[in-house]
Each structure stands twice: as structure tokens, then as C-alpha cells.
């Protein structure tokens, strides 16, 4: 596996990541047991980056539970996405962030991204300031 260094955080991150959008268990999608196997295999292959999002139904909870069951949270750089179109004020950022920490069963999120930034809801100065506060 090739790795890159994030110049801002200094994190050593795998050149390939695992997108977890299809977890969990919708028809034809991996169930929790299969998600565990996929995440475990990815880490064995040197992947250190997992990507999830608030807007993927049940996804953050599935990924968080898998990382907890497998004991892999400290080996992973975890990214999730804020549903920015649902944020109307800075307090919404706090609410979503806290909910996402709970779903992911973690005390921190390594990379917190805005989801669907091309939506018709403009990214306001308030949004950016709230996001900056969480950084």
C-alpha cells in the first residue's frame, strides 16, 4: 500500500480508502457480519481511511459498530460528512456532529466534510465558521 502524509494534520493516510456507502443490510448490500469482514480485510491490506456519511441510512452506526467489534478505531482515519443542506444555523452543526460521534461510537472524527456541497442551499459564512470551530 502506498501512503501519503496529510500536510495539515501529519496523518499518514493510505492512497486507497474504503468507501462504506453501501453498508448496511439493504437488499443486496453487506450486512453487519459482511461489513466486519470487508473492513477487517481492508485494514489487513493497509487501508487506513474509511469514508461514511450521515445521509447514508444506518451507515455510520454500522461502521462505528464494526470498528468497535473489531477493535480497529485507533488504526483508522475516519471521515464522515455533514448534511450541510440540513444546517440552518451553527447549533445544527453541533447537533449533527454530536449525533455522528454517537453513531460512530467514537470520541473524534478525523475528517469532517460537507456533503452535497452543490445542493441549492448556499454555504454561508455561518456554515463555514461553525465548521471551522469544529476543526
Residue spans of the language-model regions?
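Active-site beta-loop-alpha junctions enriched in small/polar residues
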Residues: 21, 55, 81-85, 114-117
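Short, acidic/polar
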Residues: 30-41, 89-103
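Active-site-adjacent beta->alpha loops and helix N-cap segments on the catalytic face
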Residues: 61, 121-125
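Active-site groove signature of glycoside hydrolases
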Residues: 104-120
Amino acid at each position: 500500500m502506498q501512503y501519503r502524509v496529510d500536510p495539515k494534520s501529519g496523518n499518514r493516510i493510505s492512497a486507497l480508502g474504503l468507501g462504506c456507502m453501501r453498508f448496511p443490510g439493504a437488499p443486496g448490500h453487506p450486512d453487519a457480519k459482511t461489513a466486519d469482514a470487508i473492513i477487517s480485510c481492508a485494514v489487513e491490506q493497509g487501508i487506513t481511511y474509511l469514508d461514511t456519511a450521515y445521509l447514508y441510512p444506518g451507515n455510520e452506526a454500522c461502521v462505528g459498530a464494526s470498528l468497535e467489534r473489531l477493535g480497529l478505531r485507533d488504526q483508522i482515519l475516519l471521515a464522515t460528512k455533514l448534511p450541510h443542506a440540513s444546517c440552518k444555523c451553527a447549533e445544527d452543526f453541533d447537533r449533527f456532529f454530536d449525533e455522528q460521534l454517537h453513531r460512530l461510537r467514537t470520541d473524534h472524527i478525523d475528517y469532517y466534510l460537507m456533503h452535497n456541497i452543490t445542493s441549492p442551499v448556499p454555504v454561508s459564512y455561518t456554515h463555514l465558521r461553525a465548521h471551522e470551530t469544529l476543526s
